[in-house]
Amino acid sequence: MYKAIKYINANIAEKITLDEIAGICGYSKWHFCNLFRRFTGMSFTEYVSNQKMQLAAIDILDGDKVIEVATRYGYDSPGGFNKAFLSHFGCFPREFRKNSEEANVRYKERRDKMFKMSDRCKILRDDAVNIKSKNDEISYVHDILGPIGTPPNDSGESAEYKIACKLESIILKSRPYIQEGELIVGYNFADNSSKWDLNGIWFPIENTEECRGKMIAQGISAEDVDFFFKYRERVKWVRSELPEYTPCEKNMMEEGAVVGDCIFSDHNVLDYKSVLELGFEGLLRKVEKYEEITGENELYRAAKKICRAAMKLGEKFADEIAKMRLDQSLTAERANELEKMENACRQVPAKPARNLHEAVQSLWFAHILTTWEDGNVNANSLGRLDQIFYPYYKNDIENGTITKEEAFELISCLWIKLYRDYDVQQSVVGGCDSDGNCAVNELSYMMLDVTEQMDFIRCLSVRYGENSPKDFVRRALEVVGHLQKGVPFFFNDDVMIPSLVSAGIDIKDARDYTQLGCVETVIPGKSNPHAVSGRPNLLKAVEYALNDGKSMISDTLIEGVNQPKSTELDSYEKLRDVVFAHIKNILKITCEKIVLQTEICKIRKKPYKSLLTEGCIERAKDFNSYGAVYDYYQVMLFSVPNIADSLAAMKKLVYDEKKYTLDEIVYQLKNDYPDELIRLDFLNNAPKFGNDIDEVDSIAAEVIDFCCNCLEEFSEKLGRSFHAQPFSYLWLIEKGLNTGATPDGRHKGENVAYSVSPMQGRDFNGVTAVFNSICKLPTKRTPGTTSAIVEVDPKLFTDKNMDSFADMMMVFAKRGLSNVQFNVVDAETLKEAQKSPEKYQNLSVRVSGFSQKFHLLDKELQDHIIERTKHKCF
């Protein structure tokens, strides 16, 4: 049936007869009709009519004449077409077009009622997007690296205290730069020439001399620069103290089958809410309280120093604002703004926030300190901002101390600050509260409005479930459709909360989950998620199984699995069992390597993260020494769709139909398909994940279920908590380069599938079919979350169809859809953008768990995105 469905969709504009399609598939009409109905849930005639009508509707909306569309899709007369159209959509084509136009008008009327971006924000946005003042008045090298160029004397001081001293140095010595017109102050503008952290360990620097030159040019003395590099010359990790890897392990790591790391920083959401509620004065008292109970401790000593320094951050900016207020040429409006800003900075972050302005400012200061401790922004995220800010917003509105328009402007200013350092700094709106009640509020909607008005890439996620207001889901989808930048993306509470509870997270904490970075799940202020620590390419298991346990790239024998000769795998069950044995071995080695890396993690002290993570101060344990309430390791599961497609193809063409022998296929794979016809047979004539085909979808589900069982087993054996995370980030290109040809028709070196999305170009049965396939996966066992990107043609993602998309999201919330991201773009536009990037500077796409401007991507990623199916049908 896969072949039949694919043929129908490829030739939908032609007049396809039942005799023709049954003959192509080699069945009698009676047998074909029975199989087809069982497979699709509708008759052949109904299916063809449905597909034609959805495509015809797009053409009608494009302005094509009814008679032209009728002829295009094989109708003998406009009357017959009109009748079929009426039966499908409940109206005639012209009325359908009119309804769509009216839907567009209604949206425009609604948009006109939204708060508009203020003139101030237009200027600040333009400056941020065009990076006009990034390297002008301020410098990351001068203001961040400069102050810590001469760290305190190392003798006898603990790592925690040295880091606290360096963070204090940055706070006290960095300049209080305030951009003209801004309402929220403070900055963290990254210079991509260097990456560092306060442990004094350098990440790779592309050009050391260039970095030296920049520092000297910014006024740092040559002596300080020399000391800086002497102190921070590329320190080797403590890996030299770890056990030597075996030749087999080295090969598996080099080829990407096994990557066991331990992400120890820049991927988290801290307890910013406590900064707003207590201020650093209150946090200092908390540390002192536990110090009295537990006794003196280096973590407490460091945390107290950070609290005292952080209290001065607001004062520093308040003093600068006070100087600005002396300017006699200030307008009355700006003078009033500066007075409010000074008052806010006198209050926060030292003391609790009293209103929305102070809350936004306090959170921004706290976030800056997070990134300063880590030395880069990366995936440090902000959490559920609509929930954090709502009490302040509600109180201000009720007291009449702020207007909704002013609140809109404050959120806009925060969005611009975050865009300045665009990285995956995730924020989340919607969801439920700790008791499970709907938590959608006015700010949830306002933040969606701000995101649309800003018209730039802003990492924003929406939490929803079957009990969420449909209007909220619809509004989020409108932003996706009109912004066309892949945001926001959607996380289903009805899947995510049970999956977290299954991993030992308390139900109330699970209900407060948020996203960090791309799609990674975290309990804000309570967890160290070690995001994307395990990165195994499970497709290598298929390669090993079909090559006598050896890599097809290097011919290295893989240890840990005693398998028979590949030619002895004379049944599908034997092949599957060997593939699964290799998957388990890959996961085992990955988890073991993660555990080894945790020893390195322990020496990477994070006193600021510890201060804002529940459990650390209470237990007197550092964030990276298991201090957090929840300490777990997310293990990515690469290539699940490819494994399912490969095993389904082997089952059909080798074991069931016996069209090819194992020897033939192994030869083809080792030599990257010298016979193109055989490759096309495996590519086109075997079922593929993403088309709602049980025989292949069930294999994908079985693979993930098996992986979850393995990770639970290794969690118990190794004394760690490993969370399944079927997500691939950008590494789908890299993993593919190190993987041989596979039975799904994939060439050697070709990328693997993105997360749990179908392999590009293989899903052709509509958005509903993709969702159905994904919903068959055991998503409630993957607390790290799954990730799927669905490409939709802009002609389908219209205002008229928003209710249909919202209904679909609500229905699939019940069925188990975990995370979905939409790209609303057509392939033709992307191809044009690839040819003439200067004409498409603002064209953005969903790449992985993040969006990016298309022209900034390398050609491999551009090609991958172009090749993804752009769905035109539900």
Q: PLM features: residue spans?
A:
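Terminal helix-turn-helix DNA-binding modules in bacterial transcription factors
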Residues: 2-19, 38-76, 100-113
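Short coil turns linking two alpha-helices in DNA-binding domains
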Residues: 28-29, 76-78
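Short hydrophobic/aromatic patch on the recognition helix
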Residues: 31-32, 36, 81, 85
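Hydrophobic or amphipathic alpha-helical targeting/insertion segments
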Residues: 78-80, 88-91, 324, 335-349
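…primarily DNA-binding HTH/wHTH and HhH modules…
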Residues: 84-126, 132-133, 137-140
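Conserved catalytic cores of very large enzyme subunits
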Residues: 115-300, 333-340, 344-874
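Extended non-globular scaffold/tether segments
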Residues: 301-312
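Charged, low-complexity interaction regions
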Residues: 327-332
